[in-house]
UniProtKB/Swiss-Prot annotation:
Homodimer. Interacts with A1CF. Interacts with APOBEC1; form an mRNA editing complex. Interacts with RBPMS. The lineage of its organism: Eukaryota, Metazoa, Chordata, Craniata, Vertebrata. It comes from Canis lupus familiaris (Dog). This is RNA-binding protein 47. Residues 73-151, 153-235, 248-320 form the RRM domain. Residues 1-26 are annotated as: Disordered.
């Protein structure tokens, strides 16, 4: 080969390489494994494009006709080595079903972010992928984590005026966002004519919900002149169909507060006497246990949408939570799984329905709102995720008011022997509800102090202070206040008789502070004349110069020990059983 032929060959190879690079789609051209990716696309006929920090393979696949696959067809793939790409992932995941779309999250340096989403054409293929490919060894010693993806299409919107109806909320949300399918609004437990100040908005896709969330972030848009709070709603728990076919417990919501468990049992047991085993009502919702699933389904179909005591009922099958998932939630709430599980206790324990509580507002609720440990375990106020529109990996997700399931009955602490019975606490202030920042809450209760006597039958404590130092001061202030109360007339005669028999006479007028008998009060500076002031000292005042009077000497329990200390020790405070003496203010002395 001559030099001219070699140059021509090199020129031809360069041109071919340039043409190949020109045909490579964006995101593939210049990739470390460009040749392998191009070979994959040539073999499968799929297309590939990179946008918004993710590289999409397929979506839809070649020859696809019809709508997007239904919800539940997507799986989350985690623990991907950062130098593994579609040429290695696609052969693994297409072995269990036809791939509709694979989205690999990418970094700016060309490596992946360690996770991806794979959407199959059918729901059964996604379930098979979870069963067979979880812990699949993609490389020696490197295992993939595969689980169902939470394709969340629902937003939580708080700060809505309570007088707005569902139709008004739907119309207003549709004006500022696109892809709105439905709005779920709950009536107030106390007043069915009002809503609870929040709503759930269902969108046609996760992307539409993510774009709406970005647009409605606090500070950007106001609804009806009100600031709103927006976040992802807690996704509905996807329970296996085989498990749901065995459920014989109904979840009933939108009950009146006054409705009793007996009324519910009578209403749901009308179709087959004795079919209802038990009813557990919590505020405005209840769980109804049936002896058989057939009776439960019959009652659900017959009573859903009917009225009970003036309220329209919503009846669905209760959703049990997977035991492993519940255990993970418990460990996360206690600090990342480091704490040991509580000892099983007998009996049923129901989780409180979070949407029955008041809405505290954004962002205060993220710090001290009700059911805080529901959303603190994974972070409360979350920003944008690493991927486009945020990650949809499973696990405890942060949300306002502890997260909602939009009316779906979930008895996560419903299983027998799963919960820990709550102990009765002590009442600081009657009828005071305290929102605790930590999981240890102060519950209402009553404690009697018999030693205080009938004169002071009730002590009203101050509201719990925020700071420890304030608490030290408040304790003394609010213990002194009840002591300053005058004696009640019923015990006046007994007090007068006791005072007459006392060693030291009582004062004739009620003192400003009176309480349990105390010993005489002495001056604190010896040999210094006090400034005379009329009425400054009470009748029980004993001067420092003459402590060992005959009257006081009779009260000494140890005269020998008292003599060592100059006659000031050894007095018996109990020797003043009924004396009511005045506590003098501080002695006033001239300055030096």
């Amino acid at each position: 080969m001559t030099a001219e032929d070699a140059a021509a060959a090199m020129s031809s190879d360069s041109a071919a390489g340039g043409a190949a690079s020109a045909k490579a789609p964006e995101g593939v051209a210049g990739a470390p494994n460009e040749a392998a990716l191009l070979a994959l696309l040539a073999r499968t006929g799929y297309r590939m494009v990179q946008e918004n920090g993710q590289r999409k393979y397929g979506g839809p696949p070649p020859g696809w006709e019809g709508p997007h696959p239904q919800r539940g067809c997507e799986v989350f793939v985690g623990k991907i080595p950062r130098d593994v790409y579609e040429d290695e992932l696609v052969p693994v995941f297409e072995a269990v079903g036809r791939i509709y779309e694979l989205r690999l999250m990418m970094d700016f340096d060309g490596k992946n972010r360690g996770y991806a989403f794979v959407t199959y054409c059918h729901k059964g293929e996604a379930k098979r992928a979870v069963r067979e490919l979880n812990n699949h060894e993609i490389r020696p010693g490197r295992l993939l984590g595969v689980c169902c993806s939470v394709d969340n299409c629902r937003l939580f919107i708080g700060g809505i005026p309570k007088m707005k109806k569902r139709e008004e909320i739907l119309e207003e949300i549709a004006k500022v966002t696109e892809g709105v399918l439905d709005v779920i609004v709950y009536a107030s437990a106390a007043d069915k004519m009002k809503n609870r100040g929040f709503a759930f908005v269902e969108y046609e896709s996760h992307r539409a919900a993510a774009m709406a969330r970005r647009k409605l972030m606090p500070g950007r848009i106001q609804l009806w002149g009100h600031q709103i709070a927006v976040d992802w709603a807690e996704p509905e728990i996807d329970v296996d169909e085989d498990v749901m076919e065995t459920v014989k417990i109904l979840y009933v919501r939108n009950l009146m507060i006054e409705t009793t468990e007996d009324t519910i049992k009578k209403s749901f047991g009308q179709f087959n006497p004795g079919c209802v085993e038990r009813v557990k009502k919590i505020r405005d919702y209840a769980f109804v246990h049936f002896a058989s699933r057939e009776d439960a389904v019959l009652a659900m179909n017959s009573l859903n949408g009917t009225e009970l005591e003036g309220s329209c009922l919503e009846v669905t099958l209760a959703k049990p939570v997977d035991k492993e998932q519940y255990s993970r939630y418990q460990k996360a709430a206690k600090g990342g799984g480091a704490a040991e599980a509580a000892a099983p206790q007998p009996g049923y324990v129901y989780s409180c329905d979070p949407y029955t509580l008041a809405y505290y507002g954004y962002p205060y609720n993220a710090l001290i709102g009700p059911n805080r440990d529901y959303f603190v375990k994974a972070g409360s106020i979350r920003g944008r995720g690493r991927g486009a529109a945020g990650s949809r990996a499973p696990g405890p997700r942060g949300s306002y008011l502890g997260g909602y399931s939009a009316g779906r009955g979930i008895y996560s602490r419903y299983h027998e022997g799963k919960g820990k019975q709550q102990e009765k606490g002590y009442e600081l202030v009657p009828n005071l509800e305290i929102s605790a920042v930590n999981p240890v809450a102060i519950k209402p209760g009553t404690v009697a102090i018999p030693a205080i006597g009938a004169q002071y039958s009730m002590f009203q404590a101050a509201p719990a202070p925020k700071m420890i130092e304030d608490g030290k001061i408040h304790t003394m202030e609010h213990m002194i206040s009840p002591i300053a109360v005058q004696p009640d007339p019923a015990s006046a005669a007994a007090a007068a008789a006791a005072a007459a028999a006392a060693v030291i006479p009582a004062v004739s007028t009620p003192p400003p502070f009176q309480g349990r008998p105390i010993t005489p009060v002495y001056t604190v500076a010896p040999n210094v004349q006090r400034i005379p002031a009329a009425g400054l000292y009470g009748a029980g005042y004993v001067p420092f110069a003459a402590p060992a009077t005959a009257t006081l000497a009779t009260l000494q329990k140890n005269a020998a020990a008292a003599a060592v200390y100059g006659g000031y020790a050894g007095y018996i405070p109990q020797a003043f059983p009924a004396a009511t003496i005045q506590v003098p203010i501080h002695d006033v002395y001239p300055t030096y």
